[in-house]
């Protein structure tokens, strides 16, 4: 129903290097019922089929009286989640939506075989989507028990179960002859009886069953507008309730984790109800945004339409001012009893859900001190939220000492709490990931820029009135050519392989009011300086205005960050994963250098650059070789023509 505003976008996901993390559906005795993500909406296993999420993917509602024609929709509506009590605990891995427009995919290659151990972060398979071939990796340790979709299978619907994984190697044998039909036959027969609702508990149609008594309508949900997007902010609605919508009209502007993207209409209709008001932050993927109807007379029927899923979504209020400081001395807080440690599996492994593991890492919690309340003692999100660290013994003695002088909190009005935007949050997450997982090392060199400045001056005279070529344009061109000479620097770490790219797409760091973003100069190795200059000016302008489209900043094979214009002599930049290198450019300054003349010296404009390398991909000697090629191209710019 919806698409990103740029119709000419080549791709909504990175062309290389993007990995999708799989969401698995826990099954078996005592297994928790998770929420696998299928497209932009989450399927809640506990309630069978969601009341709005999957239907809204096709613009279909139960109140319309129509039958869903979409193949994936029929499959999901006809095959509610069941538990296989005759089998050991296991995980059904569905095919997720790896791009906003993906409906089916092709299993290009399985990277793991049946019986093999899968570690956290291991690549399981490569899936060909409607945009690119995307790596598919594991979030936790397990074993491959059964592959249900063989290599080369085409048009696998999103949401189809593609493999089975187990936690224990001894459980693999139980799935030797496993098929989805066999699992369905083993399901308890009493489960379907839970479908009819009790007559004694009627619910308002607007709350529990939106769409059950309404005219034909389309419920629009928030889709994934970037590969890493998990939620978004509704910045502005461009249409009001009751207004007519024509094909191509801009409906709203959504702030994702990357940029602010226009959200436009593909079909004519009328906006009947806005479910998420302007300014609402952290709207999860799949949440209903609005209701659209085909007939104007149907608008009034949705005046009180309120699905329960969005009742908690409200515009974020400003942070409250600190309360006044009380003169009453603080009362001692009781010390919570030390929780027993979580049960450890083989070799001391602690069983923990991926979400709980992530939250524990963010809060600095030692998982061995947390008591798990999930199935078989597994640590879940609730355990992390309720965890209270144990107090050390000396703390009790310290409490007996007279209280020291208290530091008064800062009075109200002396600070400002700035809400964290989605872009800033993602920048923080990716930079932290880079520093924690990539072994950085740094190489620096000085480059004589005298020849480049002379050539630039002559070229700008020739281009007078048509634009100007900057020193940074020479740097982009020289970097791209050096990547062709030393392709190891134009590579990506893919966990199981090192992907060496055959084209050079240079990401250029641009500072914007919303945060740092890296628009891409595609095929920089074959573009001339004039074209590169034009691309950079256009991309930088769109970045600062927040008008970049996803394909203009997602991907890239090599990054350049230039702080020379701010007078910074040299610095070390953080690698942009999955790339292997980033080049930090400092300011040029005049220095005395030896020269074969009467004075014995000369004054040269020297620029300092630092190359940050991923040591898993680029060894020190290779990084030095790249810098030598880069320096040669800039000190003798005529060699760029060779």
UniProtKB/Swiss-Prot annotation:
Biased composition annotated in UniProt, kind: Pro residues: 317-337
EC number annotated for this UniProt entry: 2.3.1.12
SS bond list: none
Signal peptide (residue range): none
Modified residues (N6-acetyllysine): 461
Cofactors, names only: (R)-lipoate
Post-translational modification: Delipoylated at Lys-131 and Lys-258 by SIRT4, delipoylation decreases the PHD complex activity.
A single cellular component GO annotation: acetyltransferase complex
Subcellular location: Mitochondrion matrix
Main location per the UniProt record: mitochondrion
Pfam families for the chain: 2-oxoacid_dh, Biotin_lipoyl, E3_binding
N6-succinyllysine, modified sites: 468, 542
Ranges where the Lipoyl-binding domain occurs: 90-166, 217-293
Catalytic reactions of this protein: N(6)-[(R)-dihydrolipoyl]-L-lysyl-[protein] + acetyl-CoA = N(6)-[(R)-S(8)-acetyldihydrolipoyl]-L-lysyl-[protein] + CoA
Segments forming domain Peripheral subunit-binding (PSBD): 351-388
Residues recorded as bearing N6-lipoyllysine in the entry: 131, 258
Keyword annotations: Acetylation, Acyltransferase, Carbohydrate metabolism, Glucose metabolism, Lipoyl, Mitochondrion, Phosphoprotein, Repeat, Transferase, Transit peptide, Tricarboxylic acid cycle
Enzyme class (EC, first level): transferase
UniProt function note: As part of the pyruvate dehydrogenase complex, catalyzes the transfers of an acetyl group to a lipoic acid moiety. The pyruvate dehydrogenase complex, catalyzes the overall conversion of pyruvate to acetyl-CoA and CO(2), and thereby links cytoplasmic glycolysis and the mitochondrial tricarboxylic acid (TCA) cycle.
Description of how the protein assembles with itself and partners: Part of the pyruvate dehydrogenase complex (PDHc) that is a multi-enzyme complex composed of multiple copies of three enzymes, pyruvate dehydrogenase (subunits PDH1A and PDHB, E1 component), dihydrolipoamide acetyltransferase (DLAT, E2 component), and dihydrolipoamide dehydrogenase (DLD, E3 component) to which is added an additional protein the E3-binding protein (PDHX, E3BP). In terms of structural architecture, the E2 and E3BP components assemble into a 60meric central core with icosahedral symmetry. The central core is decorated with E1 and E3 proteins.
NCBIfam families: PDHac_trf_mito (TIGR01349)
Entry protein name: Dihydrolipoyllysine-residue acetyltransferase component of pyruvate dehydrogenase complex, mitochondrial
Species, as recorded: Mus musculus
Gene name, Swiss-Prot/TrEMBL: Dlat
């Amino acid at each position: 129903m919806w698409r990103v505003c740029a119709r000419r976008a080549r791709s909504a996901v990175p062309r290389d290097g993007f990995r999708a993390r799989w969401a698995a559906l826990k099954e078996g005795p005592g297994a928790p019922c998770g929420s696998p993500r299928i497209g932009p909406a989450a399927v809640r296993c506990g309630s069978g089929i969601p009341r709005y999420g999957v239907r809204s993917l096709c613009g279909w509602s139960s109140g319309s009286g129509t039958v869903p024609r979409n193949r994936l929709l029929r499959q999901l509506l006809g095959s509610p989640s069941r538990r296989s009590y005759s089998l050991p605990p296991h995980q059904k891995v569905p095919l997720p939506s790896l791009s906003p427009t993906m409906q089916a995919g092709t299993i290009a290659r399985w990277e793991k075989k049946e019986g093999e151990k899968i570690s956290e972060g291991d690549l399981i398979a490569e899936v060909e989507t409607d945009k690119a071939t995307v790596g598919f990796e594991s979030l936790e340790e397990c074993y491959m028990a059964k592959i249900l979709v063989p290599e080369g299978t085409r048009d696998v619907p999103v949401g189809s179960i593609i493999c089975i994984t187990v936690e224990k190697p001894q459980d693999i044998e139980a799935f030797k002859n496993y098929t989805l039909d066999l699992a369905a036959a083993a399901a308890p027969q009493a489960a379907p009886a839970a479908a009819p609702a009790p007559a004694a508990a009627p619910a308002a149609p607007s709350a529990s069953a939106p769409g059950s008594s309404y005219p034909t309508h389309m419920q629009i949900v928030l889709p994934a507008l970037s590969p890493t997007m998990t939620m978004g902010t509704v910045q502005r609605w461009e249409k009001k309730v009751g207004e007519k919508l024509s094909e191509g009209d801009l409906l709203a502007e959504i702030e994702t984790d990357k940029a602010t993207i226009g959200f436009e209409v593909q079909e004519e209709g009328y906006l009947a109800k806005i479910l998420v008001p302007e300014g609402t932050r952290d709207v999860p993927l799949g949440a209903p945004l609005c209701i659209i109807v085909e007939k104007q007379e149907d608008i009034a029927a949705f005046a009180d339409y309120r699905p329960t899923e969005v009742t908690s979504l409200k515009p974020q209020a400003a942070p409250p001012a600190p309360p006044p400081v009380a003169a009453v001395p603080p009362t001692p807080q009781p010390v919570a009893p030390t929780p027993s440690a979580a049960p450890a599996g083989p070799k001391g492994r602690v069983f923990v859900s991926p979400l709980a593991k992530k939250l524990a890492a963010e809060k600095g919690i030692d998982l061995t001190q947390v008591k798990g309340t999930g199935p078989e003692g597994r640590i879940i999100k609730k355990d992390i939220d309720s965890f209270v660290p144990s107090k050390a013994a000396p703390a009790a003695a310290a409490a007996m000492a007279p209280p020291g002088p208290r530091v008064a909190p800062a009075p109200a009005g002396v600070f400002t709490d700035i809400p964290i935007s989605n872009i800033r949050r993602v920048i923080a997450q990716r930079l932290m990931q880079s520093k924690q997982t990539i072994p950085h090392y740094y190489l620096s060199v000085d480059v004589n820029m005298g020849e480049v400045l002379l050539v630039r001056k002559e070229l700008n005279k020739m281009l007078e009135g048509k634009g100007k070529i900057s020193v940074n344009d020479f740097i982009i061109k020289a970097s791209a050519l050096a990547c062709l000479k030393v392709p190891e620097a134009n590579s990506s770490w893919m966990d199981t392989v090192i992907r060496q790219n055959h084209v050079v797409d240079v990401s250029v760091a641009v500072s914007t009011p919303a945060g740092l973003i890296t628009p891409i100069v595609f095929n920089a190795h074959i573009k001339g300086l004039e074209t590169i200059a034009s691309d950079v000016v256009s991309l930088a302008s769109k970045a600062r205005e927040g008008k970049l489209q996803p394909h203009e900043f997602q991907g890239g094979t090599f990054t350049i960050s230039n702080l020379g214009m701010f007078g910074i002599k040299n610095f070390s930049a953080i690698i942009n994963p999955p790339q292997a290198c980033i080049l930090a450019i400092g300011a040029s300054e005049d220095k005395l250098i030896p020269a074969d003349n009467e004075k014995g010296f000369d004054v040269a404009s020297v620029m300092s650059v630092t190359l940050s390398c991923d040591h898993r991909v680029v060894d020190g000697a290779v990084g030095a070789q790249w810098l030598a090629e880069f320096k040669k191209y800039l000190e003798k710019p005529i060699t760029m023509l060779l």
